[in-house]
């Protein structure tokens, strides 16, 4: 799976490299974990970088990466017969996504978009340390900036990690 994704990413880089106009973006996001992840994490925070090319009048596509951290710190207490009460505190974890990104302008200021790729977990337990990564989003552009709302998710072997995020990005270039 990783090799197939890498070949696809290289093909995307090659196809987009022929385009003449592109923009570099840098941003940050904050989010609330949802689903099962909400039981062990209170917050998702991170930074993003992307490079997108203008492929059509209202359509951009490119590559994105960054770092996203899911906080831990929730404490659970269990009563074990013969041992008393045992408390366990959850630990935080981070991801580094590598994804293709696309954006379609539905008006001069509003856009819909998404990211699709692979997320590498920064904490590995000796096994395969990653998952399929996806993030549909909707946003508003103003001047050289954008504000977006997204649903970030990672999925592997029927398990998923997800959060609802609010992000801000600054665009360098046009």
Region locations from a protein language model:
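Membrane-embedded beta-strand positions of outer-membrane beta-barrel proteins
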Residues: 26-28, 63-65, 100, 112-114, ...
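Cleavable N-terminal export/targeting peptides
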Residues: 1-23, 174
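Transmembrane beta-strands of outer-membrane beta-barrel pores
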Residues: 30-36, 45, 53, 67-71, ...
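Short glycine/proline- and aromatic-enriched beta-strand/turn motifs that initiate or cap beta-hairpins
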Residues: 19-61, 161-165, 171-174
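Flexible, solvent-exposed loop segments that connect beta-strands
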Residues: 32-41, 68-94, 120-130, 157-159
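Mid-chain, well-packed structural core segment of small domains
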Residues: 105-127
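Residues that define the transmembrane beta-barrel architecture of outer-membrane proteins
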Residues: 22-24, 41-45, 92-96, 120, ...
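Repeated loop/turn-to-beta-strand initiation elements of outer-membrane beta-barrel proteins
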Residues: 57-61, 109-112, 142-149, 174
